[in-house]
Amino acid sequence: MDFVKLCIDLLLETVGLQHLNLGYKGVVPRHRRAVEEQKVYVCIHEWGGYPPVRQKHINSTICDWECGLKYQLERFENRQDVVLTVTMSDAHRSNDIAEITTRCDHFIAVPNRGMDFSGYGAFYQSIRGLKNCYVLLTNSSVNSLQSDFLDSYIDYMERNTDVGMLGVSCCSKCYQTLVQNNFTPHLQSFFLLTTLDVLTEVVSLNGGQFPGAGICNKQLLIRRGEIRISQLVLQLGYKLAVVTEFGVAKFDNNPKNWTLPYGDFRAYTDKPNAIHPI
Protein backbone atom coordinates (compact mmCIF):
# COMPACT_ATOMS: atom_id res chain seq x y z
CA MET A 1 0.00 0.00 0.00
CA ASP A 2 2.86 2.42 0.81
CA PHE A 3 4.40 1.69 -2.58
CA VAL A 4 1.10 2.52 -4.29
CA LYS A 5 0.93 5.81 -2.35
CA LEU A 6 4.49 6.60 -3.43
CA CYS A 7 3.63 5.94 -7.08
CA ILE A 8 0.57 8.20 -6.83
CA ASP A 9 2.66 10.97 -5.28
CA LEU A 10 5.26 10.70 -8.04
CA LEU A 11 2.60 10.76 -10.75
CA LEU A 12 0.84 13.82 -9.32
CA GLU A 13 4.16 15.67 -9.03
CA THR A 14 5.15 14.82 -12.57
CA VAL A 15 1.94 16.33 -14.00
CA GLY A 16 2.15 19.33 -11.67
CA LEU A 17 -0.87 18.56 -9.48
CA GLN A 18 1.16 18.10 -6.28
CA HIS A 19 4.27 19.80 -4.90
CA LEU A 20 6.55 18.79 -2.02
CA ASN A 21 7.59 22.42 -1.61
CA LEU A 22 4.54 24.12 -0.11
CA GLY A 23 5.74 27.53 -1.33
CA TYR A 24 6.50 30.79 0.42
CA LYS A 25 4.27 33.36 -1.27
CA GLY A 26 1.39 34.36 0.94
CA VAL A 27 2.94 32.83 4.07
CA VAL A 28 2.69 35.29 6.98
CA PRO A 29 5.92 35.43 9.06
CA ARG A 30 5.40 34.41 12.68
CA HIS A 31 7.24 34.19 15.97
CA ARG A 32 7.08 31.37 18.48
CA ARG A 33 5.30 31.75 21.78
CA ALA A 34 7.65 31.72 24.78
CA VAL A 35 8.16 28.45 26.64
CA GLU A 36 6.56 28.10 30.07
CA GLU A 37 8.54 25.08 31.24
CA GLN A 38 12.30 25.20 31.82
CA LYS A 39 12.87 21.49 31.28
CA VAL A 40 13.90 20.25 27.83
CA TYR A 41 12.03 17.11 26.79
CA VAL A 42 14.29 14.86 24.73
CA CYS A 43 13.28 11.80 22.72
CA ILE A 44 15.97 9.42 21.45
CA HIS A 45 14.59 6.84 19.05
CA GLU A 46 16.37 3.53 18.52
CA TRP A 47 15.77 0.34 16.57
CA GLY A 48 16.09 -2.70 18.83
CA GLY A 49 18.35 -4.57 16.42
CA TYR A 50 21.18 -2.05 16.54
CA PRO A 51 24.24 -2.58 18.78
CA PRO A 52 25.07 0.23 21.24
CA VAL A 53 27.93 1.38 18.95
CA ARG A 54 27.87 1.06 15.16
CA GLN A 55 29.25 2.43 11.91
CA LYS A 56 26.84 4.37 9.68
CA HIS A 57 27.13 4.19 5.89
CA ILE A 58 24.93 6.20 3.50
CA ASN A 59 26.69 6.13 0.12
CA SER A 60 30.06 6.77 -1.52
CA THR A 61 29.65 10.57 -1.47
CA ILE A 62 29.27 10.75 2.33
CA CYS A 63 31.94 9.74 4.86
CA ASP A 64 31.12 6.83 7.14
CA TRP A 65 30.93 7.67 10.85
CA GLU A 66 30.62 6.06 14.25
CA CYS A 67 27.36 6.47 16.14
CA GLY A 68 25.02 4.58 18.45
CA LEU A 69 22.69 4.82 21.42
CA LYS A 70 25.67 4.63 23.80
CA TYR A 71 26.83 8.08 22.72
CA GLN A 72 23.34 9.57 22.77
CA LEU A 73 22.74 8.44 26.35
CA GLU A 74 26.14 9.84 27.38
CA ARG A 75 25.25 13.13 25.67
CA PHE A 76 22.40 13.85 28.07
CA GLU A 77 23.78 12.30 31.27
CA ASN A 78 23.83 14.52 34.35
CA ARG A 79 21.63 17.18 32.69
CA GLN A 80 19.19 18.20 35.40
CA ASP A 81 17.23 20.28 32.89
CA VAL A 82 16.56 17.31 30.57
CA VAL A 83 13.69 14.84 30.78
CA LEU A 84 14.89 11.93 28.65
CA THR A 85 12.66 9.41 26.88
CA VAL A 86 13.99 6.52 24.82
CA THR A 87 11.59 5.09 22.27
CA MET A 88 12.44 1.77 20.65
CA SER A 89 10.94 -0.06 17.71
CA ASP A 90 11.29 -3.86 17.60
CA ALA A 91 12.33 -3.72 21.24
CA HIS A 92 12.26 -7.54 21.46
CA ARG A 93 15.49 -7.55 19.43
CA SER A 94 17.44 -5.66 22.10
CA ASN A 95 19.44 -7.25 24.92
CA ASP A 96 20.11 -3.88 26.55
CA ILE A 97 16.67 -2.69 27.69
CA ALA A 98 17.38 -3.25 31.40
CA GLU A 99 20.43 -0.97 31.23
CA ILE A 100 18.74 1.57 28.96
CA THR A 101 15.82 2.02 31.34
CA THR A 102 18.21 2.91 34.17
CA ARG A 103 19.71 5.71 32.05
CA CYS A 104 16.54 7.48 30.96
CA ASP A 105 13.41 8.84 32.61
CA HIS A 106 10.94 7.03 30.37
CA PHE A 107 11.07 4.10 27.96
CA ILE A 108 8.41 3.52 25.28
CA ALA A 109 8.31 0.46 23.03
CA VAL A 110 6.73 1.24 19.65
CA PRO A 111 6.00 -0.60 16.37
CA ASN A 112 8.61 -0.29 13.62
CA ARG A 113 5.99 0.95 11.15
CA GLY A 114 7.00 4.59 10.77
CA MET A 115 10.56 3.93 12.02
CA ASP A 116 11.87 7.07 13.78
CA PHE A 117 8.53 8.79 13.31
CA SER A 118 6.77 5.98 15.16
CA GLY A 119 8.89 6.86 18.18
CA TYR A 120 8.59 10.60 17.70
CA GLY A 121 4.80 10.32 17.39
CA ALA A 122 4.46 8.18 20.53
CA PHE A 123 6.70 10.58 22.43
CA TYR A 124 4.61 13.55 21.28
CA GLN A 125 1.46 11.84 22.53
CA SER A 126 3.11 11.32 25.93
CA ILE A 127 3.93 15.04 26.40
CA ARG A 128 1.19 16.81 24.44
CA GLY A 129 -0.63 17.86 27.62
CA LEU A 130 2.38 19.68 29.11
CA LYS A 131 2.99 23.42 29.18
CA ASN A 132 4.94 24.81 26.24
CA CYS A 133 8.54 23.58 26.43
CA TYR A 134 11.54 22.85 24.25
CA VAL A 135 11.39 19.45 22.56
CA LEU A 136 14.27 17.57 20.93
CA LEU A 137 13.59 14.67 18.57
CA THR A 138 16.70 12.66 17.74
CA ASN A 139 17.93 9.15 16.99
CA SER A 140 21.02 7.02 17.43
CA SER A 141 22.58 7.93 14.07
CA VAL A 142 24.00 11.17 15.50
CA ASN A 143 27.79 11.26 15.17
CA SER A 144 29.69 9.98 18.23
CA LEU A 145 31.61 13.28 18.53
CA GLN A 146 30.61 14.89 21.81
CA SER A 147 30.17 18.61 22.46
CA ASP A 148 28.50 20.83 25.03
CA PHE A 149 25.79 22.14 22.73
CA LEU A 150 22.37 22.28 24.37
CA ASP A 151 22.65 25.59 26.23
CA SER A 152 23.90 27.40 23.12
CA TYR A 153 21.04 25.96 21.06
CA ILE A 154 18.43 27.06 23.58
CA ASP A 155 20.02 30.52 23.76
CA TYR A 156 19.86 30.75 19.96
CA MET A 157 16.20 29.76 19.91
CA GLU A 158 15.43 32.32 22.61
CA ARG A 159 17.07 35.07 20.54
CA ASN A 160 15.52 33.92 17.26
CA THR A 161 11.83 33.40 17.87
CA ASP A 162 11.16 33.38 14.13
CA VAL A 163 12.83 29.94 13.97
CA GLY A 164 10.30 27.15 14.36
CA MET A 165 12.72 24.24 14.18
CA LEU A 166 16.50 23.82 14.35
CA GLY A 167 18.61 20.93 13.07
CA VAL A 168 22.24 19.97 12.56
CA SER A 169 22.04 18.87 8.93
CA CYS A 170 19.83 19.67 5.96
CA CYS A 171 19.14 19.03 2.31
CA SER A 172 18.03 21.42 -0.42
CA LYS A 173 16.07 18.92 -2.47
CA CYS A 174 13.98 15.77 -2.48
CA TYR A 175 15.77 12.81 -4.05
CA GLN A 176 12.65 10.61 -3.82
CA THR A 177 10.94 12.19 -6.84
CA LEU A 178 10.97 12.18 -10.64
CA VAL A 179 11.28 15.99 -10.64
CA GLN A 180 15.07 16.30 -10.75
CA ASN A 181 15.67 20.04 -10.35
CA ASN A 182 13.41 20.57 -7.36
CA PHE A 183 14.03 22.94 -4.46
CA THR A 184 12.61 21.32 -1.34
CA PRO A 185 14.68 22.55 1.63
CA HIS A 186 14.35 20.50 4.80
CA LEU A 187 16.12 19.55 7.99
CA GLN A 188 17.26 15.96 8.32
CA SER A 189 15.16 14.26 10.94
CA PHE A 190 17.84 12.61 13.09
CA PHE A 191 17.99 15.87 15.11
CA LEU A 192 15.10 18.36 15.38
CA LEU A 193 14.84 20.97 18.14
CA THR A 194 11.52 22.78 18.42
CA THR A 195 8.83 23.62 20.99
CA LEU A 196 5.74 21.72 21.99
CA ASP A 197 3.56 24.54 20.67
CA VAL A 198 5.13 24.38 17.21
CA LEU A 199 4.95 20.59 17.15
CA THR A 200 1.27 20.74 18.06
CA GLU A 201 0.67 23.21 15.22
CA VAL A 202 2.49 20.88 12.83
CA VAL A 203 0.34 17.91 13.84
CA SER A 204 -2.82 19.98 13.52
CA LEU A 205 -1.86 21.23 10.04
CA ASN A 206 -1.12 17.61 9.08
CA GLY A 207 -4.71 16.61 9.77
CA GLY A 208 -4.15 15.61 13.39
CA GLN A 209 -1.58 12.95 12.53
CA PHE A 210 2.12 13.06 13.30
CA PRO A 211 4.05 13.28 10.00
CA GLY A 212 5.34 9.91 8.82
CA ALA A 213 3.15 7.90 11.18
CA GLY A 214 2.45 4.35 10.01
CA ILE A 215 4.62 4.46 6.87
CA CYS A 216 6.98 1.55 6.15
CA ASN A 217 8.31 2.43 2.70
CA LYS A 218 11.54 4.36 3.31
CA GLN A 219 11.22 6.62 0.26
CA LEU A 220 7.64 7.54 1.16
CA LEU A 221 8.68 8.06 4.79
CA ILE A 222 11.34 10.59 3.79
CA ARG A 223 8.74 12.44 1.72
CA ARG A 224 5.86 12.33 4.21
CA GLY A 225 7.96 12.33 7.36
CA GLU A 226 11.30 14.11 7.15
CA ILE A 227 10.48 16.52 4.32
CA ARG A 228 6.86 17.02 5.35
CA ILE A 229 7.63 18.10 8.91
CA SER A 230 10.02 20.84 7.72
CA GLN A 231 7.62 22.01 5.03
CA LEU A 232 4.78 22.24 7.55
CA VAL A 233 6.92 24.39 9.87
CA LEU A 234 7.63 26.73 6.94
CA GLN A 235 3.97 26.78 5.91
CA LEU A 236 3.09 27.88 9.45
CA GLY A 237 5.20 31.01 8.91
CA TYR A 238 8.34 30.04 10.82
CA LYS A 239 11.88 29.72 9.50
CA LEU A 240 14.17 26.72 9.78
CA ALA A 241 17.75 26.92 11.05
CA VAL A 242 20.67 24.53 10.76
CA VAL A 243 23.90 24.44 12.79
CA THR A 244 27.01 23.19 11.02
CA GLU A 245 30.75 23.53 11.62
CA PHE A 246 30.50 26.72 9.56
CA GLY A 247 27.93 28.40 11.82
CA VAL A 248 24.16 28.86 11.82
CA ALA A 249 22.04 29.46 8.74
CA LYS A 250 18.33 30.32 8.55
CA PHE A 251 16.25 29.43 5.53
CA ASP A 252 12.74 29.17 4.16
CA ASN A 253 11.10 28.03 0.91
CA ASN A 254 12.45 30.98 -1.07
CA PRO A 255 15.43 29.76 -3.16
CA LYS A 256 16.86 33.30 -3.11
CA ASN A 257 17.45 32.93 0.63
CA TRP A 258 19.39 29.66 0.35
CA THR A 259 23.06 30.16 1.30
CA LEU A 260 24.14 26.55 1.85
CA PRO A 261 25.53 23.95 -0.58
CA TYR A 262 22.91 22.31 -2.78
CA GLY A 263 21.95 18.70 -2.17
CA ASP A 264 22.64 16.69 0.98
CA PHE A 265 24.86 18.77 3.29
CA ARG A 266 26.53 15.61 4.58
CA ALA A 267 28.37 15.28 1.27
CA TYR A 268 30.23 18.52 2.09
CA THR A 269 31.57 17.66 5.54
CA ASP A 270 33.98 15.12 6.99
CA LYS A 271 31.86 14.98 10.16
CA PRO A 272 28.37 13.99 8.97
CA ASN A 273 25.54 13.96 11.52
CA ALA A 274 27.73 15.76 14.07
CA ILE A 275 26.38 18.23 16.63
CA HIS A 276 28.39 21.46 16.71
CA PRO A 277 27.92 24.06 19.46
CA ILE A 278 27.03 27.60 18.44
Regions found by a protein language model. Give the residues of each.
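ER/Golgi luminal nucleotide-sugar-dependent glycosyltransferases, focusing on the catalytic module
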Residues: 1-278
